[in-house]
Amino acid sequence: MGTRPEAIKLAPVVAALRRDAAFACTVVATGQHVEMLRQVTDQFGIQVDAYLDVMRPDQTLAGLTARLMTAIDDWLGRAAPDIALVQGDTTTVLVAALACFYRHIPIGHVEAGLRTGNIGSPFPEEANRRLAAPLVTLHFAPTESARDALLGEGVS
C-alpha cells in the first residue's frame, strides 16, 4: 500500500488476515504518502512491516514506475510470498502485478474491474487498472458491472 485510500480499504482485510493463524500477513508500504499513510495505519493499528521508500522530489511517473519495479521486485525476491494483494488503481498496483507475474507469484486485486470506458481518464489510473488485469490471479470485483467488465475483456 502507498496511499491513504489504499490503507483505509485494506485495513479490514489486513486485520482479518492477521487474526487468522493460517496466514502470515506482511504489510509493505511504498512510501508514496508517508505521513497520511501513517495516520491511517496508526488509527487502524496496522503495523507496516516494510517501507520501500520510492518517492523522490519532482519524480516523473516513469521514474516512479522504474523505482517501484526495482523496489517491489527486490522485496519479492527476499520475502518470496505465497501471494500478494493490492488494492485500487495506483501505479503500485500495475507494477506489483507485473513484478509478481515475472516471479510467478500469484496476486489478488481488490477493486478489480472498475472501468470508466476511457483509458486516458482518469490518468493514469484507468490505464493502471486495465494493464494490471490480465496479470492478476485473483480478481476481487466490487460490483457485478466490474465483474462483467473483466469478463468482457477476457479476464476470468
What is the predicted function of each stretch?
Residues 21, 79, 103-105:
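Helix C-cap/helix->beta junction micro-motif
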Residues 105-156:
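Active-site-proximal region of nucleotide-activated glycan assembly enzymes
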Residues 1-31:
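N-terminal subdomain of nucleotide-sugar transferases
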Residues 69-80:
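Short, well-structured alpha-helical segments in soluble
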Residues 21-67, 71:
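Conserved nucleotide-sugar phosphate-binding/catalytic loop shared by glycosyltransferases and other
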Residues 85-103:
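An aromatic- and histidine-rich active-site surface loop
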Residues 3, 89, 143-145:
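Helix N-cap/beta->alpha junction signal
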